[in-house]
Amino acid sequence: MEAKLSSIQIPVDQDELSGTLLTPTGIPAVLFVHGWGGSQHHSLVRAREAVGLGCICMTFDLRGHEGYASMRQIVTRAQNLDDIKAAYDQLAGLPYVDPQSIAVVGLSYGGYLSALLTRERPVEWLALRSPALYKDEHWDHPKMSLNADPELMDYRQRVLTPDDNIALAACADYKGDVLLVEAQHDAIVPHPVLRNYANAFVNARSLSARVIAGADHALSVKEHQQEYTRTLIDWLTEMVVGRRIALAKEVVAARKHRLKQQSDALSSPGQGTNEFRGDIRAVENSSS
């Protein structure tokens, strides 16, 4: 993400007014990844809100869902991760998107895959709601077979480290900002899973954790859905808009400093100038 400050001249009558143009360059983007059995329709409410922040948003359907529901019994985690990479690449390739300012929002199975995505694509901000965990083995087996594992729920009650799971290992390597959202009464992705994720983000720039009181995995109650939307949008506002404001402050401060230098460089008192000419850029260092 970048902010640019430029001096401009505004013609009026026979004169030219001195002005300053302050602009962001490159638009941040948000990729939404739905959960198992879901669809992009579940993401559109949050995407609509994120667009209000000035973000480009993309939702899509994983194979095994909607138009590719015929693949439901055979689609694998590897294929769905490829789906996410393809969607990410299309979003990042848009000419007006800043490829260093992309957020990924993943739900449940989509959250698990989104964590894995961070090892293969630059993700500046990562929001995970009730991210699932699966055993590493049988990566290329149909995803449906994973849910049939009688030990899966026991696995999700265990204390696991990045050495035990590839998704947690990806989290340990991640250096961006993280939002973790837990449903208090989630019987599918219980609290130990969220604890394992939180403990894995040892190198994250920031980690925000929220619990939606009384909520189940599906956020069946409308008020819980609304609370999640507010939580996500508030966090995105802090990350994206806050970053833009910080960069704008930086270029304005740089302009002030440069004007002071110009004034100090003049030997005759009172001969300084408050007119600035040129461009100043402030670039945010990305996590990648």
Spans of model-derived segments:
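Hydrolase active-site cap/lid region
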Residues: 116-160
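Short alpha-helix in the alpha/beta-hydrolase fold that links the catalytic acid
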Residues: 176, 190-200
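Catalytic histidine-centered segment of alpha/beta-hydrolase-like enzymes
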Residues: 215-226
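N-terminal cap/lid segment of alpha/beta-hydrolase-fold proteins
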Residues: 1-24
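Catalytic nucleophile-loop/oxyanion-hole region of alpha/beta-hydrolase
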Residues: 37, 65-95
